Design a protein with these regions (language model features):
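Non-catalytic C-terminal accessory region of glycerolipid acyltransferases
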Residues: 2-5, 95-211
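Catalytic core of membrane glycerolipid acyltransferases/transacylases, capturing the structured
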Residues: 6, 19-20, 32-91
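Glycine-rich, highly charged phosphate/nucleotide-binding loops
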Residues: 21-25, 91-97
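Short gly/ser/thr-rich secondary-structure transition/capping motifs
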Residues: 19-27, 151-152
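Short, basic, glycine/proline-bearing loop/turn elements
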Residues: 13-15, 81-87, 114-118
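Short amphipathic alpha-helix with an adjacent loop that forms part of the alpha/beta core around
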Residues: 30-33, 101-102
């Protein structure tokens, strides 16, 4: 994938802010393959999740963003130049699905959230079928990721972010044999999403030694 200088500049600025305001632990970066295509599947508690998780991944990331953010002028220019994928959250968005699959087929790296939306209480929510569909259709490796602390830093009902440690655990890549069961019929994509979500739920921060 061609290097996007604007993306990397923005990433660097966000990383500085993250290290200053939300510094936490990062575990398992070695599990992220050096090259794409690749799906990063994470829990979702906060608007902070996409940019902060993106700072932990040594790749140029494609993110979903709701279509309403594409406003005339600078917002439209900005969203296009950092190569976000517009998605209509009011219904099934075939266009977003096609763009995501195309990005992966081109060797890209995409972050998706199996829960589909931010958690109301910071707890893990049931997975929806979308991530499973994309994973099964492309057969790409899926790296499960779990974010800790972003709900406390900027939960769904918060007005402004609060300084709080945000930590990340990245698991080993799941291969198609780990999540896809073509014989499962109509439940294939939902089952794949649930297997991916189970891998996310299994991730924990290492226990700290007792003093």
């Amino acid at each position: 994938m061609k290097r996007n200088l604007l993306y990397w500049l923005c990433r660097q600025l966000i990383c500085v802010a993250s290290d200053t305001v939300f510094r936490g632990e990062v575990v398992g970066v070695h599990n992220v393959p050096r090259t794409g295509p690749l799906l990063i599947a994470s829990n979702h508690c906060s608007h902070l999740d996409p940019p902060l998780l993106g700072c932990q991944i040594p790749h140029q990331i494609r993110f979903f963003a709701r279509k309403t953010l594409w406003k005339p002028g600078i917002p439209n220019w900005w969203m296009n130049h950092i190569e976000c994928i517009p998605v209509d959250r009011d219904g099934a968005d075939v266009g977003a699905l096609k763009k995501t699959i195309a990005a992966l087929e081109a060797g890209g790296v995409v972050i998706l959230f199996p829960e589909g939306t931010r958690s109301m209480d910071g707890q893990l929510q049931p997975a929806k079928s979308g991530v499973g569909m994309i994973a099964c259709k492309t057969g790409v490796p899926v790296v499960p990721a779990r974010i800790f602390g972003s709900f406390e830093a900027f939960g769904r009902n918060a007005k402004i972010p609060t300084p709080h440690p945000v930590s990340y655990v990245l698991g080993r890549p799941l291969r198609p044999a780990d999540y896809d069961d073509p014989a499962s019929g109509k439940q294939r994509y939902q089952l794949a999403s649930e297997r991916i979500m189970a891998a996310i739920a299994a991730l924990e921060l290492p226990a700290r030694p007792l003093l």
